[in-house]
Amino acid sequence: MRMSAGLSLLIPLWGRTFLLLLSVAVTQSRWPSEPSDAVRDWENQLEASMHSVLSDLHEAVPTVVGIPDGTAVVGRSFRVTIPTDLIASGGEIIKVSAAGKEALPSWLHWDPQSHTLEGLPLDTDKGVHYISVSAARLGANGSHVPQTSSVFSIEVYPEDHSEPQSVRAASPDPGEVVSSVCAADEPVTVLTVILDADLTKMIPKQRLDLLQRMQSFSEVELHNMKLVPVVNNRLFDMSAFMAGPGNAKKVIENGALLSWKLGCSLNQNSVPDIHGVEVPAREGAMSAQLGYPVVGWHIANKKPPLPKRIRRQIHATPTPVTAIGPPTTAIQEPPSRIVPTPTSPAIAPPTETMAPPVRDPVPGKPTVTIRTRGAIFQTPTLGPIQPTRVSEAGTTVPGHIRPTMTIPGYLEPTAVATPPTPTTKNPRVSXPTKKPRTPRPVPRVTTKAPITRLETASPPTRIRTTTSGLPRGEPNQRPELKNHIDRVDAWVGTYFEVKIPSDTFYDNEDTTTDKLKLTLKLREQQLVGVKSWVQFNSNSQLMYGLPDSSHVGKHEYFMHATDKGGLSAVDAFEIHVHRRPQGDRAPARFTAKFVGDPAPVVNDIHKKIALVKKLAFAFGDRNCSTITLQNITRGSIVVEWTNNTLPLEPCPKEQITGLSRRIAEDDGKPRAAFSNALEPDFKAMSIAVTGSGSCRHLQFVPVAPPKRVPSEAPPTEVPDRDPEKSSEDDVYLHTVIPAVVVAAILLIAGIIAMICYRKKRKGKLTLEDQATFIKKGVPIIFADELDDSKPPPSSSMPLILQEEKAPLPPPEYPNQSVPETTPLNQDTVGEYTPLRDEDPNAPPYQPPPPFTAPMEGKGSRPKNMTPYRSPPPYVPP
């Protein structure tokens, strides 16, 4: 009994001992063998706690590292393949979104089939975008339980980013890109197709599909094409040397520019075959395949972005200007500081932040590592001025403050002690309730206070403070030049305009450029005149102009940006005016005659620009750069221009005919649409369209009188030196001299005709002479024409010539019985005359012999010839 009771008491004791030994062994096995192991475990737990978002370490989602950061360029396609095998290895669901958000940025598209993230960013998408890729598994209750996640960044660069770098980053074949890269200073030839589309209304998939459909016409890869929206309604490029129309009659949407590279520094002779773009764009085949109307196309040379020039500051300003000193290499600290006062500092609340935009945003999750580029403000609050070191000797105040120049970031002023001046007093520290106040650059009259000199390049301006000796607020900082304008290209006779980008200047108080006041000036602080060929609208911040042939060359201008406090920054840039890209090879010249005097139009740049805009509107063009003004002459207002959209070769006869019928009738009278477009400022009288260049032998619209097209292009403007003299010379040259020449030719021709007529009529008889000598034969000799030297023979005896013999005696008639005294009349003689012949005894009749003397000529006559023939002698019976 006692034994059983002892066993019953030992069993619980052994059980407790066994449990104690077992717990000690387990504890010893889990405790680290060395102190270093314990420390290492503590560090691991600390590191895990730092990277954990939740309070419990076991509930945190593990982070997978392996997706590299990417870069994209505005207007170019972006594509990256996500290695899902690193994230989802067991069939989990992949979710891609912006870090800390539920959806992707508006320019990105995720394809779950190919595990590809692709898109096309616009100008509004610049900056750094953090993308989160997570894998989730479907839980028992139907919800998605996160398993793993990874975050990477995509930085979007602006459109003018270095092309080789951007292309090399996106191209799968680096060797192909390197072979097509142009030199640093060599222009890039780009072909641009203008589409009637709005990229802001497209989803990312539609933008990429548009680029893919364009591949059949461009024959280039996606990463080499660029698609950007139209900015400031500039559909066409003024620097284009080739252009063509599309099938769109008018533009409805904002417009999109789809371009790709053709080569380096090409011209019209070296441009490759573009019939694959020109013909489909005009006939509508391209529009049918792309799904959007095609407005037109053009080819231009784009100058690559050059390194930024050294800032040239104009120092003749009435406001304080920071003196340029050697760059400092001091470590940049956050712009918050402690005011050296024995009381609490005056720090503005975070809601009054006015800091320049920072490219790298702070990610939503603390597990993301941020790679900063440039100056980043760790504390985005508006703090007072940086502390300065002041050396005091006796009664001395802080003197000349000379800010130093730093590379990107904020200005960090340093202090320079001035010699002691016994006339000033030490500043006293004010009460901590005093709020800062921004000093004005204009001298202000206040109470007696110490004077602080601010050293500038311009004449020093005294800034008076109150007796407290501390500034009442953060001083106004001058605007900073962020991006240079550098260079503007213009062409003779072609209207140009340049919108100043909003990121050209930046001011800490007034922010971007559109909040600043811009002024265009010449070298010596001289404002641009009203009659200058370059004008600037400060309200819209638009620079525009219309150069002529006298402005060819390089011109330097200065853009001043002034903030509300009166401080300014300056950017120097150049305007290069080139000669007409087409020269004299334009296929047609349009000439219009308007009512009025040309002098006001020639001397007023605004009227010339208005004329060019109205002419472009009459042709249905929204871009004024399609019109190149050639000349404005007298004779009312005669305006001559060319159309830059016409191809040079071969002769675009159909296009010119279509443009001619759009503005003029067949007889040269302006159409109603053309007149309505230019009225009431310009009233058209007549229009002429003459072929030139490749169409020089054609006349499209008749002109009365026809005007011969000169071989050389006349100047764009009438010279202002002596317009009256030039007009008189034109009148003499085109009116007086031709009239005198024609009159002289007619006079000489009349004289020659008269001489020939007189010579032809010489030797011919008049009608009376012809009537007198009608019959040919022996002429009749009148009595006064006879030779009176010999007496005429007697009429009683017959005429016997000297060579003749004596006549025979008269015959005798023995049977005659009629007495001699019986008179016979003519009838009786006639009756009896034949009776004598019948006498058988009568001798035969013998006629007198002929003349023996020869006939000397037609006009000669025989000598001693009587004017009439004598009858035979009368022989009585």
Swiss-Prot record:
Q: Where are the transmembrane segments?
A: 732-757
The record's annotation in SUPFAM superfamilies points to: Cadherin-like, Dystroglycan, domain 2
Q: Where is this region: Disordered?
A: 380-444, 458-480, 706-727, 805-877
List the disulfide bonds in this chain. Answer: 182-264, 651-695
Q: Which CDD domains match?
A: alpha_DG_C, Dystroglycan_repeat
Site keyed Cleavage: positions? 635-636, 697-698
Q: Which GO terms describe its cellular component?
A: basement membrane; cytoplasm; cytoskeleton; dystroglycan complex; extracellular space; nucleoplasm; postsynaptic membrane; sarcolemma
Annotated region Required for laminin recognition: the residues are: 30-408
Residues bearing the modification Phosphothreonine: 772
Region O-glycosylated at seven sites with GalNAc: start-end pairs: 446-468
Compositional bias per record (Basic and acidic residues), positions renumbered to this chain: 718-727
Any single GO molecular-function term of the entry would be: laminin binding
Please report the stretch or stretches of sequence annotated as the Peptidase S72 domain: 585-694
Known role: The dystroglycan complex is involved in a number of processes including laminin and basement membrane assembly, sarcolemmal stability, cell survival, peripheral nerve myelination, nodal structure, cell migration, and epithelial polarization.
Which protein are we looking at? Dystroglycan 1
Species name:
Sus scrofa (Pig)
